[in-house]
Amino acid sequence: MKNKIFLAIFLLMLTIGNAHALDNSKVLSENGVTIPLVADRITDNGEEGAILNAQVIVKNGTGHVFIDTSPYTQVDLQGSTRIAAMVASDVLGIDQKSYDFYYIIEVDSPIIGGPSAGGALTVATIAAINNWQIKPGVVMTGTIDPDEAIGPVGGIPFKLEAAATENTTLFLVPQGQLIVNITNVTMTRRGIADHSVNTVDLNELGKKLGITVKEVSTIQDAVLEFTGHDIRKQSTNKTVFTANYLNLLEPLALQLANESKNMYNNTAFIDNDLIKNALDLQNQADGLANNKKYYAATSLYFQSMVNILTSQWEYQYDHERDKDQYITNLINTVEKQIQNSENDLDKFKSNGISDVEVVGAAESRIMEASNILEDVKNLNNTKDVISRLAFANERARTAQWWLTLFVPSGKIIPEDVLKDRSGWYLSQAQSVSTYIQSLISGNGGPIIDKGDITLVQKEIKRGYYSGAIFDSLRIISSSSTVIKLLEVQDPSARINQSAKAAEIAINEARSEGIEPTLAVSIYEHGEILTNPFAKMSQYSYAKMVAKTTESLYSHALPSNETIKPDITIPIVNRSITPITDKKSPAFEAIILIIVILVIRRLKN
């Protein structure tokens, strides 16, 4: 009875919410769509599949996600609905904060979990937004990743058998899971569990059950099978690295090349691994610059300068009498650099935010440098203190570098829009990381360092809303990459898929008159990485940044700001000279007397 009352109130809220919709909003179906879900559950006879029904309704609103389940389900199903709403909006290029999403799921008995329903829920959300019908007889299992991929799940044979009881004709599974292993557990007479593994060919099992089994890799593939509508976007022949982008980055790369090499030449007398590594990094960066990978080159020049500055400061520390005062002076130096970068950023933003990516990149780097400076006070090891201070100093300088990459857009994004979105994206990042953590619980420690979330919270508190948005996206992309690579033997196909999605998103932004410099630079950095996780994470991040930037500019206002501000990178004197141990005159006289006495004795 209570559930019926709640459902009545729930549906009444939908009606009221729709009554207040804007006149120019999209007309959405009152009843939404209903889609079958498959899950697995534990019974007295062991693991078995279960068929559920989900009703998905989308109304004009403010970005909220509501879920009504009976009985209460685990956090992973709730997380699946949040991801479904986010991905559906992303795929269709709509503003998620203009809609509210309602998921009504009836569960006959407790299920093991709900992540495998994510793909189907996303399909239903896309169908509800477009008023499309769901084909009868189609059932799907698979998680949904924030970058639109269908992820692997367990218990597929049991789910396939359950689907067969509901007149299913087509059963969709994640790519790479046509053949799966099932662990059977039987108890011996002595009460000992006996484990055996069976390999199941789902195509063969499907034939026995009269069902076609088919793989899908992306949500676009799944939507086509469920609705007949093809929303896949073809990769264009347009390059990611346009002449405008290369011309923008080249001067910065050349300036950093000169600065880092001058630093090395003035410090080469210090013979340690940091200096040797700095030279190697410069050589690698030169090669990248010659191949017009200017942003990737600047990243290596940056690392080189951090190494050299660390060596310089360590060398000077070793030769200082008052070492405590020297560390205090270094802290003051870094504080001054951070303040200079903050002042440049404030001046840059004084006329409004016209290039949100450049501002976001600068804000993120200033906040990171400030955070490191805070943490240094808790370190006891002097070498760690010096190396972290050197990194913080150079990281703060990169904010100034980014401001030189400004591209006038002729538009200003209102601060209240950025403030509102920063809180929303932080909430999304927290939800995604919690959701994905629930999927791999027991397989290791936390995916995302709590410090990453804390940093975003500090950015919002400080008014660095653009930086908070892009740092939240980085958390989301890192979290989603973890699940994408789970149990994947050869990640190359998924990496290529992520790269292609990023390429499409970047060129879509350009088609709207936006130059997504940050997104392209992230993509470029991903190209030089070799670690599969890091590479895929960068491509996923690049795509999210490009799409989010496009969304933010949809709220921009016209501006007369078309002239690039006069911003230059300050030239910093990094030269040091070898320090020789000073001897007192008396000491030198004693040495001379000893030499004379030795000579006289030899003559005798």
Q: What positions do the PLM features span?
A:
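Peripheral, non-AAA+ core regions of ATP-driven protein-machinery
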Residues: 21-290, 297-298, 314-316, 328-363, ...
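Sec-dependent N-terminal signal peptides
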Residues: 5-14, 592-595
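Short, Lys/Arg-rich N-terminal segment immediately upstream of the first membrane anchor
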Residues: 1, 12, 577-581
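Long, charged/polar, soluble alpha-helical segments
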Residues: 207-209, 216-585, 599
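Bacterial N-terminal signal peptides that target proteins for export
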Residues: 1-6, 584-585
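Sec-dependent signal peptide cleavage junction
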Residues: 16-23, 578-583
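C-terminal membrane-anchoring or membrane-association module
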Residues: 594-604
